[in-house]
A protein has these predicted regions:
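Conserved catalytic cores of very large enzyme subunits
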Residues: 2-290
Length: 290
């Protein structure tokens, strides 16, 4: 029998391995919590298990692991730009040096981190980091030459700048939707964020890349719009759960400040895209999925 929360559509030996220990995991996790409650709140310790059994309270991922893990994590991608994932996986020799290696290493990073938590891994700087490598390959103001050919005369497949960016999108999306052995054959839960101009200025106005350059709003805006449009079209053809998207906007009490992004948000919902919207009166907070 498969756990209703297991996110699997068919049984195989990989997800069976994950399911078979869930009863034991649940007993261990529940006893750990009861032991702690007996120390902190002995008067309610006995009630804890009764309330769980009667679905009055809920404990997240109680059966997924016998050890205590945090639920979700949001991570900065800056160490990825400067060090790569070698300090985690012990294999990758250096930081990413082009668009393709960045797409590979960010996928590896998400898999590595997801094995150390029960929930999601949020990479809110995905488009900021991606732009760093787009600029490295295609130069400043790459967004003005999206339809320029960017492959050598010796290449049989001719690709434009736009094609290469879409290729990076595909590598990232196909990667994070792959089943993971360490997650009982589930994909690693992955979150990304889109920012309106107000959010971008507040969060990244003073941000510098490792080479001292700064991200341009027009470049980030172009990447975000390209990804949203492309991802929505791909989802019409196949089920792709990840990344889960959050669209962040700032309001002034009367309306969204960045009216262009208010319009984009409405357009994407009208086109059937599925994403979360987070609206705040200040860019000092951020939501990813939850």
């Amino acid at each position: 029998e498969t756990d209703g929360n297991a996110n699997v559509t068919m049984k195989n030996v990989a997800n069976l391995e994950g399911e078979v220990y869930k009863t034991t995991n649940r007993i261990i996790q529940r006893q750990r919590m009861k032991d702690e409650l007996n120390i902190l709140f002995p008067e309610v310790a006995k009630q804890y298990e009764t309330d769980l059994d009667n679905h009055i309270i809920y404990t997240h991922d109680e059966a997924s692991t016998p050890v205590l893990k945090q639920y979700c994590m949001a991570v900065s991608l800056y160490p990825l730009l400067t060090e790569g994932v070698g300090n985690i996986d012990g294999v990758t020799p250096s930081e990413p040096n082009d668009l393709q290696s960045f797409s590979g290493q960010i996928t590896n990073l998400i898999f590595l981190l997801s094995s150390q938590c029960k929930g999601a891994v949020a990479v809110g700087e995905y488009f900021i980091a991606l732009n760093y490598y787009v600029v490295k390959e295609f130069g400043d103001k790459w967004y003005e030459k999206l339809d320029c050919e960017a492959s050598s005369p010796h290449c049989l497949i001719k690709r434009t700048v736009r094609d290469n960016i879409l290729k990076a999108f595909k590598q990232f999306v196909w990667g994070v939707n792959q089943p993971a052995g360490n997650r009982s054959y589930q994909s690693p839960f992955t979150n990304i964020s889109y920012y309106d101009h107000t959010y971008f200025t507040s969060l990244f106005g003073e941000f510098c890349y490792p080479d001292g350059s700064k991200p341009e709003w027009i470049a980030i805006d172009t990447l975000q719009r390209m990804f949203m449009k492309w991802f929505n079209q791909i989802r019409l053809k196949q089920v792709l759960t990840f990344p889960v998207e959050t669209f962040a906007m700032v309001h002034n009490g009367d309306d969204i400040i960045d009216l262009n992004y208010k319009q984009l948000c409405a357009e994407m919902y009208a086109e059937g895209h599925s994403f979360f919207t987070y609206i705040s009166d200040s860019a000092d907070s951020l939501a990813s999925c939850c």
